[in-house]
Amino acid sequence: MEQVAEGARVTAVPVSAADSTEELAEVEEGVGVVGEDNDAAARGAEAFGDSEEDGEDVFEVEKILDMKTEGGKVLYKVRWKGYTSDDDTWEPEIHLEDCKEVLLEFRKKIAENKAKAVRKDIQRLSLNNDIFEANSDSDQQSETKEDTSPKKKKKKLRQREEKSPDDLKKKKAKAGKLKDKSKPDLESSLESLVFDLRTKKRISEAKEELKESKKPKKDEVKETKELKKVKKGEIRDLKTKTREDPKENRKTKKEKFVESQVESESSVLNDSPFPEDDSEGLHSDSREEKQNTKSARERAGQDMGLEHGFEKPLDSAMSAEEDTDVRGRRKKKTPRKAEDTRENRKLENKNAFLEKKTVPKKQRNQDRSKSAAELEKLMPVSAQTPKGRRLSGEERGLWSTDSAEEDKETKRNESKEKYQKRHDSDKEEKGRKEPKGLKTLKEIRNAFDLFKLTPEEKNDVSENNRKREEIPLDFKTIDDHKTKENKQSLKERRNTRDETDTWAYIAAEGDQEVLDSVCQADENSDGRQQILSLGMDLQLEWMKLEDFQKHLDGKDENFAATDAIPSNVLRDAVKNGDYITVKVALNSNEEYNLDQEDSSGMTLVMLAAAGGQDDLLRLLITKGAKVNGRQKNGTTALIHAAEKNFLTTVAILLEAGAFVNVQQSNGETALMKACKRGNSDIVRLVIECGADCNILSKHQNSALHFAKQSNNVLVYDLLKNHLETLSRVAEETIKDYFEARLALLEPVFPIACHRLCEGPDFSTDFNYKPPQNIPEGSGILLFIFHANFLGKEVIARLCGPCSVQAVVLNDKFQLPVFLDSHFVYSFSPVAGPNKLFIRLTEAPSAKVKLLIGAYRVQLQ
């Protein structure tokens, strides 16, 4: 990168090519990178030698802008010296025989653009490529700055002819030297023309190559060298800007301020990479830095002067030309315009930073070396972050407000380039090539970074709120100064609406407001109470297990009510989902009848279940509200929840002991409601809790009928498979119990399921149609299996503890087959309707389910 920066500088300032070559050689001896410096200087000087040899010819070719093929002939778009872009013409190659150097330069530009994609995997980069890429960049940018008037061009032409003959000879000698060396390289790389990537890819690869090639013992040298490289990159950017100006007045501008910059750069180059040598050149280096800063600021200030209403020109001709350039670029509105503005902005920011910094240079270099070493440890894969990126937070602090207007004009073009052309680039490359001046989009990106926290970092919301303006550890490893940058970006975020695209502002603000609102207190509709930090929307990622359990138990917060809350207010609060009011009321000393019904028979639990208010439901259940209350039409809270399709509400009610087989006045159960809605999750949940799939509604329809009616195959298959499982388990249990001495012929009625916890009484009605031919020696037995459901698995038994006390069929007691066990009863149904009643033991907390089935059996 030393070579890249120096090459670009020689390109921009050919008059000092020889001196800079010697300075480059001195630095390279210090860091172990030697060679090709004279060749690089000669190659960089070539770009100017050819176009300035014939200054007296008015019709001299300034440069070639483009090429095309028409009718088998290759035509070149020519910019004539002293003329504007409106006078560009397409000329055949034969007309350009006297301008072979210009043609050669254009071909090199084409070749280098093409070679970028090919060289992606090549570790070693040749120096001349970077030199000519710098030329091609500045050439393209200078296309937008050619609209100066012909009168000024003639003035500059006269000044140019006064140029010293020694400098001219120097250029011609170097140009001739380069001609012989560069032709073979050109011809080998002209085969395919691909205009893809920009200079930053090669810069990044050169960084990696430098990092890999150097020995570990030269780490300190490398770190200081990175700092020097950034300084030289700044001067190179300034001189690339110089090259963008029309070539007639280049001499005048260069002679005014380039010499001071060359002296400053030579001071930087001769600065030893070791800390102990830094103090020697402290005073001279600071003096030359100020001189360099002053010159650069004058140029950048002129470029922005038109918009901000102040002008500080070096001289009248220079100021007028800068104004013309600004107007011309604004008319064209190309991506190049945005790049010019960004470069000027970057330059001004950097110089402002250098001017305002008062720390001694030795201390600064030590700090930078320290930060570079830390970055190298933490980022082994990527190259070290450029200094400009590391200090971007402080640069933003020094950002002047008068650049906001121009920032608005360029932000759209800039954002398009970033998101289309640079989507896959590294963060370091982005930090180098992105505009340092356009702070707004970087701040938006930093604001987005704050929300990409890992769950561990979001574990405690109070800590998160306390440190919201700090950056996570992951981001500190990327950028030493990024914490300051993010703090500042959060403070200034409110001012970015006028400076950024609407979508970007809304995205960043919206995400931040979501974070802010986690623990932010709002006032409810009454304006008296505040919303809990653990409010209705549970933020489970930061909630601890103890907090969550307290929340489930209703013990998370305690409020002292100032005034007693009336019952009607409590009912309205439950209906509206006002968690705070309900909690305050239930935690007060006031006594409420939680099972009180309204005119339709709705209790508070039913209201909460029908509204899907899970938190309120848990709170009411914790305070002792009953979950099995029934309206006048037989509807329960579980039926309400299933009908409204609230899965979690159904789960809470089932866990609290809600009865699943309760029927409405029309005979429908919660299972039937779930089948109607086609919610397979609720169906599975109530089935596994012991719902009876064979209960018939008032119109003699079962749950299977409603599943088929809802046209939901999943629900239908779920029910069918469950019924088949129950039948299979019952038959296998009978065979095992009777040791295969009993043959099952046919079922008398479908298997019914009753949960013992739902009550000590079971009753059902069924129709019995006896077969025409009753097999000899056969009879009917009633089996009452005690079963447990383990998910889809069902385990049944006909022995052990028994909860059956009596069986009554059509008002007649049925006798047990075995006196010591009441699992199997003799059974004598009549043809037609029959009514079965079974008296069971009272066991409200029992988990056992009773499977009740009757079969015609025959002894074998």
UniProtKB/Swiss-Prot annotation:
Residues 129-191, 206-440, 458-496 are annotated as: Disordered. It holds the Pfam family Chromo. The record marks 59 as: Interaction with histone H3K9me3. Residues 431-560 are annotated as: Interaction with humanin. InterPro entries: Ankyrin_rpt, Ankyrin_rpt-contain_sf, Chromo-like_dom_sf, Chromo/chromo_shadow_dom, Chromo_domain, Chromodomain_CS, Dendritic_Spine_Reg/Scaffold. Phosphorylated in M (mitotic) phase. Phosphorylation by CDK1 promotes dissociation from chromatin. It comes from the Eukaryota. Heterochromatin component that specifically recognizes and binds methylated 'Lys-9' of histone H3 (H3K9me) and promotes recruitment of proteins that mediate epigenetic repression. Mediates recruitment of the HUSH complex to H3K9me3 sites: the HUSH complex is recruited to genomic loci rich in H3K9me3 and is required to maintain transcriptional silencing by promoting recruitment of SETDB1, a histone methyltransferase that mediates further deposition of H3K9me3, as well as MORC2. This is M-phase phosphoprotein 8. It comes from Homo sapiens. The lineage of its organism: Eukaryota, Metazoa, Chordata, Craniata, Vertebrata.
